[in-house]
Design a protein with these regions (language model features):
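Nucleic-acid endo/exonuclease domains
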Residues: 1-120
Length: 120
């Protein structure tokens, strides 16, 4: 990891942890913290800060608000996802609406991806 990026992004990550959205809090406290693996919130994977990261299986979990559906943001997300995949990460993206309306399915999907990565 590039230390200059990390030094700049760490304060941002700390701030984002304190200002989680309602959907991030719900997913974190009611699902991700209960998983049998360590999940990091607002993890620096330079040059980005990802919403959630499971290091044991290199799984990135991103929650997208409505701004992510604007062309500029969707292009940035595609570039970000490509970079993370080059680093060997799998990226799961869910909308805030997914968390609000399909919460159980989102949690099951995340759990299944973790289980799949633990399988030989």
């Amino acid at each position: 990891m590039n230390n200059s990026y990390s030094a700049k992004l760490t304060p941002l990550a700390n701030s984002l942890r304190k200002k989680m959205t309602k959907e991030e809090r719900h997913l974190w406290y009611d699902c991700l913290k209960l998983l049998p693996v360590t999940v990091h919130r607002q993890k620096v994977i330079a040059p980005y800060v990802v919403d959630f990261y499971v290091a044991s299986c290199k799984l990135v979990i991103e929650l997208d608000g409505s701004q992510h559906y604007e062309r500029k943001h969707s292009e940035e997300d595609a570039k970000r996802d490509a970079y993370l995949k080059k680093q060997g990460c799998e990226v799961l993206r869910y909308s805030n609406a997914d968390v609000n309306l399909r919460y159980r399915q989102v949690c099951e999907d995340i759990y299944n991806h973790i289980q799949k990565s633990d399988s030989p």
